[in-house]
A protein has these predicted regions:
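Long, internal scaffold/assembly segments composed of regular secondary structure
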Residues: 231-323
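Cap/lid and interdomain-hinge subdomains that line or gate substrate/regulatory clefts
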Residues: 2, 7-9, 107-232, 236-239
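Periplasmic-binding protein-like
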Residues: 71-80, 99-101, 269-274
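Short, acidic/small-residue loops that bind anionic groups at enzyme active sites
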Residues: 89-115, 120-128, 293-308
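Short beta-strand elements in bilobed, periplasmic/extracellular small-molecule ligand-binding domains
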Residues: 31-55, 142-148, 205-211
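Extended hydrophobic packing segments that form well-structured cores
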Residues: 370-472
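Short, well-structured alpha-helical segments in soluble
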Residues: 59-71, 88-90, 257-266
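C-terminal catalytic subdomain
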Residues: 296-415
């Protein structure tokens, strides 16, 4: 990624303090279990360690630590029964979900030979799960529960922990990076319009505004020929250029990509939304003609780039790229009623990681519906499971996610330079369009290879955003 971010995960464990002097063997047992649990978190996140909590004061200290670190998520390991006052001081001032980890050490107790200490230490993690959720509900806190076992390993538990960590990466990415808006949204596409202050309030994402005049000159100071040549080769390695291509032919494009990469790093940009509606002449025309492949090179490196100035779809692309490794701009493109297939795609920049074969680049005289002409890029999404995500708003500015899963199938696609794919939905193409549209999406959405609704639901819980699931 051009701009790296790392989720901050608050972690602590709780046990009833009254047990410890009664059964001293529980102290090393619980400490060992807690240390083992922390090792199950992936190294892609930063652990903010609140320690093992058995008193209200320790819980308050953990909460102070979590607030100071601005954690993106909290894992609470339940070691045995504990009262909720061990939990609430640590989380009452946080606005992130608390994931209750109810992992029992043993698959089952030896009923004939288990004493009280062994029961409390190795078979009683479930004792307070309901109590914790009851009080989290009363405090208006978002929550989830993971139940499983340590003995013999539990792949389901490990998968859930890693999935929550992936979801938490989105919050950190939105908080630690910015979105650049270059120009303004496409005139009249009112579904794309957005209040940037409300965006920052609800999604923690700050908008930096840029004028096209600055973009036209962005490459003027790029003189490192080795860097330009290397980027030109990177472009040739990424795309098959219609009619062939050479380093010399993509030199100017490579120069702009090098400049954009520096700009992204300097401004800490995780997302870009742009639209140009001026005269495509002179330097403006040069940049406009090569912007689509240039921004595709940024998407390849983790910076979501959306056309038509659509900030909301840039967020959807960034979410999918962060949780799945792919994030492609899309919209309803056509319907194949003969095969009951939805054709889904879009013109503009795309994600090379979603393409099953080398993407193509071709020159067109006009960008349909837009000013100027130049390079189009077409990507060829993998067949198999696919996830779609749209982000929309209600009349009060609250955000909503709309998600669907389908299957991309082999078959004929359009080949005039726009990315498009053939998606089959379990509900059928007609019903999919009806259901999807009734959810009130913007006309843009994002696509990712694989099935990711479960992770999207976690992202939504972290941001406290509702989700409409259209079909799975």
């Amino acid at each position: 990624m051009l701009v790296d971010t790392k989720a901050k995960i608050g972690v602590f464990s709780i046990a009833l303090g009254a047990y410890l002097p009664q059964f001293p063997s529980l102290v090393p047992e619980f400490q060992s279990q807690y240390e083992a649990f922390k090792k199950t978190l992936p190294d892609t996140v930063e652990i903010v360690d609140g320690g093992m909590v058995t008193t209200k004061e320790q819980s308050q200290a953990a909460g102070d630590l979590f607030r100071a670190a601005d954690v993106d998520l909290v894992f609470l390991q339940l070691l045995t029964y504990a009262t909720s006052y061990n939990m609430l001081p640590a989380v009452k001032d946080l606005d992130v979900p608390v994931v209750l980890v109810n992992i029992q050490k043993l698959k089952a107790l030896d009923y004939d030979h288990t004493d009280i200490a062994t029961w409390l230490g190795e078979g009683y993690a479930c004792g307070a799960v309901g109590e914790m959720v009851a009080d989290l509900e009363r405090y208006g806190k978002r929550h989830a529960v993971i139940t499983g076992v340590v003995e013999g390993g539990d792949p389901g538990v490990q998968a859930e922990i890693e999935d929550w960590c992936r979801a938490a990466q989105v919050r950190r990415r939105f908080r630690d990076t910015n979105i650049a808006q270059i120009g303004r949204p496409y005139p009249g596409m009112m579904d794309l319009y957005i209040d940037e202050s409300n965006l920052y309030r609800r999604m923690h994402l700050y908008t930096k505004q840029f004028d096209w005049e600055k973009m036209w000159a962005i490459a003027d100071d790029i003189t490192d020929e080795d860097a330009i040549r290397a980027k030109a080769q990177d472009i040739l390695d990424t795309f098959d250029i219609e009619g062939g291509g050479s380093i010399e032919e993509v030199w100017e494009m490579a120069k702009y990509v090098v400049a954009f990469e520096k700009w992204v790093k300097d401004e800490k940009l995780g997302l870009i939304a742009s639209h140009y509606d001026g005269f495509a002449q002179g330097k403006a025309g040069v940049l406009d003609s090569m912007l689509i492949p240039a921004f595709s090179m940024l998407i390849k490196q983790g910076t979501a780039c959306a056309v038509e100035g659509d900030i909301k779809v840039a967020m959807a692309m960034s979410i999918l790229k962060t949780i799945s490794g792919t994030g492609q701009l899309a919209e309803m493109y056509s319907l194949d009623f003969n095969d009951d297939i939805a054709i889904i795609g879009h013109s503009g920049s795309g994600d090379a990681d979603i393409s099953d074969k080398k993407p193509t680049m071709k020159i067109v005289k006009v960008f349909h519906g837009k000013t100027g002409g130049g390079y189009l890029t077409q990507f060829y999404p993998y067949t198999g499971p696919v996830t779609y995500l749209a982000i929309t708003q209600d009349g009060d500015g609250h955000f909503k996610f709309i998600a669907a899963e389908g299957v991309n199938e082999e078959g004929p696609i359009l080949s005039f330079g726009d990315t498009n794919m053939r998606t089959r939905f379990t509900c059928g193409a007609r019903e999919f369009v009806n259901r999807w549209s009734e959810c009130g999406p913007t006309h843009h959405f994002a696509a990712a290879t694989g099935r990711h609704i479960d992770t999207i639901l976690k992202v939504a819980k972290i941001f406290n955003v509702p989700v409409d699931i259209v079909t799975r």
